[in-house]
Structure formats: structure tokens, C-alpha cells
Amino acid sequence: METYRIAGYFKNKCILITGSTGFLAKIFVEKVLRAQPDVKKLFLLVRASDATSAKQRVQNEVIGKELFTVLEEKHGRGFHSFIEEKVFPVAGDIVHENLGIEDSILTELWKDIDFVVNVAATTSFNERYDVAMNVNVLGAKNVLEFAKRCAYVAGEMEGLIPEKPFSMGETLNGNSHLDIQEEINFVQERKKELQADKSTERIEKITMKELGMKRARHFGWPNTYVFTKAMGEMLLGHLRGDLPLVIIRPTIITSIYKDPLPGWMEKTRTIDSFIIGYAKGKLTCSLGNPKLTMDVIPGDMVVNAMIVAMAAYLNNQSEIIYHISSSMRNPVAFSILQLCVYQYFSKHPRTGKDGKTIKTRKVPMFRNLASFHTYMVLRYKLPLEVLHLLDLILCRSISHRCNELRQMYNFIVRLAELYAPYTFFKGCFEDINSRRLWMAMMKDNTEEIPLLDFDPKSIDWEDYFNNIHIPGVLKHLCN
């Protein structure tokens, strides 16, 4: 990395950002505009029917968000003219060839773009297989093919997980060979069968979700999301040619740690479901090993690493992987989150819909399925059966209590099933490449460290959870 400001690499540059209405993309757009106001253009790809709709979406879902308050204060009355000069919404969708962009502006984009930042993805763990395949696999391929035409753009494991690309066809369990084209054909054929059988939309959705989880686990991945993202990476590595390729692999992304708004976040993420469930009095137990490490990293650190990596890798023609994680340098156990949640709600008790204070209790974390299921039977299943009989005898007068208990049971079971691969995860993500990147920045760009910090060792986890993340979850997610 050359010895001058990292932000300088983006001066007079044009960047295309996909998935631009998403959490990470918003942080990226805000940070680039604030760190390098002399960036030439940011093209924001959004799903929209036309340019007018795209512009409206960007205004409502990106620029109009609280996240941009600091940038707005910096520019004052000139904020809107600054945005109009730098930010260009583009209607399109990565699932289509040429990203679904109108032919009339394609040539201009191919001529101007210096960087393509793809953060478009469907991140639901149990997404429909066809949807995840289209976005996370074929979408990534479409973005790569688009980038090649730009003039200036040249699972279930244990132990140490290396920062290396996936080999084409690689599986995590050695269970046969993964043929991506066969998977694409398989999901398309299954969908045709469902349509031929005149299956309802609900049946098709359930079948596709189950198919995704089944195929993921067959090849050793815990869910559809990480499986399809891995296949997307394989295609990128296989098809990139001499195109410079930087792949950022963040672990569980949490709220902003420092900059610009500590605690800011959008959409419920892995650990947030536990916090929200506890806040609403719905979580009475969980499944996992409290002594194991939960690998979490704040969203602003992920974006900072993206920016530094882009600058460092600008003139390289190879591929590199960066794990943006905390398990190697600053591990935090699930027990710390448990403790922080209990401490926070002991000091700041919540009020339920009935106006009563929700009691703060320590939530047990069961280390095996047998003890978890025993607890759920005694705590929920048996009482539900008794209440159901009483409800029949009392002419449905306590139906609301039955429904409430059933909802709590379903919530806890679904949470346990969905997140068990993470609450029992015994791996540790190697971060040698990320560490080298950080050390290079420490050596040559010390003045930018406060703005572009991505060192997980700087995080005090108890302070972060108690004073930043949990309050952020309650403010932005817990309605």
C-alpha cells in the first residue's frame, strides 16, 4: 500500500454499488462520500421499474436515512446539491444479464466505472433455493461479467478456517463433487415439476425452502445462504480471468461500533433475535454452548475493511480473500452476550403490551438437544395440552392464552433450529490477510485509523453490547 491517504485512491473515481438499499451498502456509500467528497460518481443499482422509481427508492431508503445525518450536517445547505452531483441511482437487478440496466446508459457505465462493489444478496438462512440461487450464485456471475466490460476495472467446520478461495466443486464434508450447473438445472427442473402439478404458491415456497436446506446440508453447509454464497464465490474465482477480485467474508454483522452513528442498524440479524425475544419476554431458554465463541463484527468495521482492501488491491490482477472477523484476535463467548442482556434489562426493564413490567430472568442455554426438548415439553407442550382441554371445556374463553403460549413455543424452537449451526460452531476464522492489511495501514496511514478502523482488538465487548448494540437493537428493531 503506497504511503498516502487511502481516501485518495477514490478521488475522481466512479464506483458501481449493487444491493445499494441494504445495510452494508448504505454504510459504504455514506463512508465514501464523507471520507472522499472528491469521488467522481457513485452509481447505486436498485430494483426499480424506471429511473424515476430508482431515484425515489434511493432517496427514501438510502439518503433519507438517519445514517446520513452526520454527512448532512457536514455539508449544511449544500447537502442535497452534493448528493445530486455524486449519487446516481440506476434501475436494474443483478439476476439479469447486464444487471438489467437499460441499453441507453450501459456504454456510459462501462466507460466510466473504476470499481464494482457487489453487496447484493439474499441473506435469509432458509431462503427459497431458487431465489438464493438466482441472487447469490447467478447474480454474482452477472456482476462479474458486467465488471469485465468496464474499461477501468482490470460452513460446518471446526478448527482454523483459512482465508483461501473455494475450489470449483469443493464441498465441506467430502460428500461427492459439487457441480454448480447441475444444481442450477436441478432447482429449475424441480420448480417446473411444481408448476406442472399446479402447486399453490405456499407449497412451492415451502418446497423450495426445504430443498435449499437439504442441498446445503448434503454438501456440508449449514444453510441455504452460506451454501449459495460459497457457490457464487466459486464461480467468481473460476470465471474472473485477470480481473482483480477482492472477496470480503464478514462473520455475523452487528450494529455500527463507532462511525457515524454507534448502534445504528437495519433488519434483525442472528444475535438480535435473541435480544428481541428477551426484550419481549418471549425467550425463556436457548440452545447452544455458552462457552463457545460467537464470531461477530460491527458493520462499520466491515465497510472500513472493504474500503482499505479496495485501495490496497487496486492494481493487482489476482484474487484475495479477507476474513473480517473477531474470533482470532478478540473472541467473545455467548456467555458474555447472555450476561450483558441480563444486566441491561435488569437496569432497564421493559413494559409488555399489557402494561406490566416484563420480569428480568436469567435464560438457560442448553448444550444438547435432549435437555432442550425435555425443557420445552415440560415448559410448553404439556401445559399447552392441558390449556387446550380447559379451553374446550370453558368454551374458548382462554384461547388467547393458548395462542400466546403456542407462539412462544414456536418462536423458541424456530430460533434454536435456525441458529444451532452457529451456537454450536467450533471454528475460528483465520485472518492473516486482514491482519496484514491492518498492519500496512497502521504503518503508512496512521492519520486515517480513526476513520477506517477495522481492528477487532479495539472492541470492549461488554461495553459494546451494554452501551451500543443492545440499545441500538431496541431503538431500531424492537417496535
Predicted regions and their residues:
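NAD(P)-cofactor binding segment of oxidoreductase domains
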Residues: F115, E127-K148, A154, M168
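Conserved catalytic-site region of short-chain dehydrogenase/reductase
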Residues: F125, A151-E156, I253-S255
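Conserved beta-loop-beta element that borders a ligand/cofactor-binding pocket
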Residues: E193-G263, I271, N315-Y322, S327
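C-terminal beta-strand-loop-alpha-helix "lid" module of Rossmann-like NAD(P)-dependent dehydrogenases
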Residues: L261-T284, L405
